[in-house]
């Protein structure tokens, strides 16, 4: 298998891995709908995957600190490929849910280890840009993946899972040939650390606020991924159009990461955080009130822009403030995973009890509580920079 260098790994691998997963994560709810699944079962797809992810991601990050990054980075796509391959034969909703849990194992050991590997490839002022390149790579797949998945599903419901399995197996062989463990590089030129350390109350207070914001973002995203397809199918929207609509989230995240990567003005700025969450609130209101596809696309763009800031901030501050990068990326992944655990499941409960638009009212309530908590954390401690 051909080898690629470090720069290409950072540019290509997140795209490749997330393309595989985004193909799976649209096709899985659609096939559960075809199997007669209800909204709670749709939500359980995300909840099962994210529960395993949440529990194991922190452990995976810490294990990568001890065992090295390579073994976990290589194992992740292999486990994901096996789960996709088995899904091609699944005939019951229970089978899909069980395999979604196996997916969570692959994601939980891959992402924290790979993020820590990326963080160790640069230090000082280049860290934020390197994380930005990583973020742009995986979100580029979110533009293509849902659209491709919807198209493949329209050909045959099992084709998306064959495609995701093939992509994951190829990635396994590429990583096995290309990735090696490394020691963290020293900061160039004695770069100043503007964000403090884990002993800094101000920096950590802002980090906790960002973690809460990112939890809320992924609570919302979980509902969009696993509950919106049901609302859309009830409105007679085709699978390919659903994929196009969900791709709007990836497009706006990509653009958000692109602009954030080129500036540090948003670092530790409460106004940027609150502004991003105002975008999410606006998008949720649009989904809750209006039925038009163009309005849905606009709402997804607003929410995607918001998520780009909370995700970028959470990952960057986690590896910048915490001394052990595997620990930082593990916590980052576990916290966003907890949002995906609760979001789709609770959204499914209210959708079944009240109606298909109820999950978006629930998301608005969670977002409001999150903002109140963030204001308390960022006001009670002195932030390094306002």
What are these regions (language model features)?
Residues 2-50, 206-209, 218-235, 242:
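Helix-loop boundary and gating motifs at the non-cytosolic
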Residues 50-58, 142-143, 250-258, 340-341:
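Residue-level signature of mid-helix packing/kink "hotspots" within the transmembrane helices
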Residues 56-68, 153, 256-269, 351:
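Helix-to-loop junctions at the C-terminal end of transmembrane segments
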Residues 71-85, 271-285, 364:
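Structural signature of the two symmetry-related core transmembrane helices
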Residues 109-122, 309-322:
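Intracellular juxtamembrane helix-capping segments at the cytosolic ends
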Residues 160-176, 360-375:
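Symmetry-related core transmembrane helices of the 12-TM Major Facilitator Superfamily/SLC fold
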Residues 270-314:
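C-terminal transmembrane helical hairpin of 12-TM major facilitator-type secondary transporters
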Residues 324-353:
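A late C-terminal transmembrane helix in Major Facilitator Superfamily
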């Amino acid at each position: 298998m051909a080898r690629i260098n470090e720069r290409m790994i950072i540019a290509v691998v997140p795209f490749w891995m997330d393309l595989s997963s985004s193909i799976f994560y649209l096709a899985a709810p659609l096939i559960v709908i075809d199997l007669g699944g209800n909204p709670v079962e749709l939500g359980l797809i995300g909840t099962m995957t994210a529960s395993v992810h949440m529990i194991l991601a922190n452990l995976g990050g810490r294990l990568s600190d001890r065992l090295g990054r390579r073994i976990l980075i290589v194992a992740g796509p292999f486990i994901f490929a096996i789960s996709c391959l088995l899904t091609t034969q699944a005939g019951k909703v229970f089978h899909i849910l069980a395999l979604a849990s196996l997916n969570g194992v692959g994601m939980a050991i891959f992402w924290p280890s790979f993020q820590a590997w990326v963080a160790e490839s640069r230090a000082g002022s280049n860290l934020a840009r390197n994380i930005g390149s990583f973020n742009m790579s995986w979100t580029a797949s979110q533009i293509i993946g849902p659209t491709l998945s919807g198209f493949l599903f329209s050909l045959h419901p099992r084709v998306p899972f064959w495609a995701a399995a093939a992509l994951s197996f190829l990635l396994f062989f590429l990583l096995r040939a290309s990735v090696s463990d490394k020691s963290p590089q020293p900061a160039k030129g004695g770069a100043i650390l503007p964000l403090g350390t884990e002993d800094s109350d101000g920096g950590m207070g802002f980090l906790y606020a960002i973690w809460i914001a990112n939890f809320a973002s992924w609570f919302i995203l979980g509902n969009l991924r696993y509950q919106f397809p049901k609302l859309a199918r009830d409105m007679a929207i085709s699978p390919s159009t659903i994929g196009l609509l969900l791709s709007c989230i990836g497009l706006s995240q990509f653009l958000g990461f692109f602009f954030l990567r080129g500036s540090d003005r948003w670092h530790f700025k409460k106004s940027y955080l609150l502004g991003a969450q105002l975008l999410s609130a606006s998008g949720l209101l649009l989904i809750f009130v209006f039925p038009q596809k163009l309005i849905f696309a606009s709402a997804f763009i607003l929410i995607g822009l918001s998520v780009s800031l909370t995700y970028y901030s959470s990952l960057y501050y986690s590896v910048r403030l915490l001394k052990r990068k595997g620990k930082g990326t593990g916590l980052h992944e576990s916290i966003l995973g907890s949002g995906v655990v609760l979001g789709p499941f609770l959204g499914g409960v209210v959708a079944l009890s009240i109606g298909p638009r109820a999950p978006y009212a629930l998301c608005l309530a969670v977002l409001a509580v999150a903002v109140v908590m963030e204001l308390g954390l960022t006001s009670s401690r002195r932030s390094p920079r306002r």
